[in-house]
Amino acid sequence: KVIDVKCTSPKQCLPPCKAQFGD
């Protein structure tokens, strides 16, 4: 899965992006 470059931290990401961090 490609990580969204706008997401630098799970805390500031939307749920779909947080999932990319495994959170």
Swiss-Prot record:
InterPro entries: Scorpion_toxin-like_sf, Scorpion_toxinS_K_inh. Keywords: Ion channel impairing toxin, Neurotoxin, Potassium channel impairing toxin, Secreted, Toxin, Voltage-gated potassium channel impairing toxin. Gene3D superfamilies: Knottin, scorpion toxin-like. The keyword Secreted applies. It is found in: Secreted. It comes from the Eukaryota. Its main location: secreted. The keyword Secreted applies. Expressed by the venom gland. GO terms for molecular function: ion channel inhibitor activity; potassium channel regulator activity; toxin activity. One of its GO terms (cellular component) is extracellular region. Potent selective inhibitor of Kv1/KCNA voltage-gated potassium channels. Has the structural arrangement of an alpha-helix connected to antiparallel beta-sheets by disulfide bonds (CS-alpha/beta). Belongs to the short scorpion toxin superfamily. Potassium channel inhibitor family. Alpha-KTx 02 subfamily. This is Hongotoxin-4.
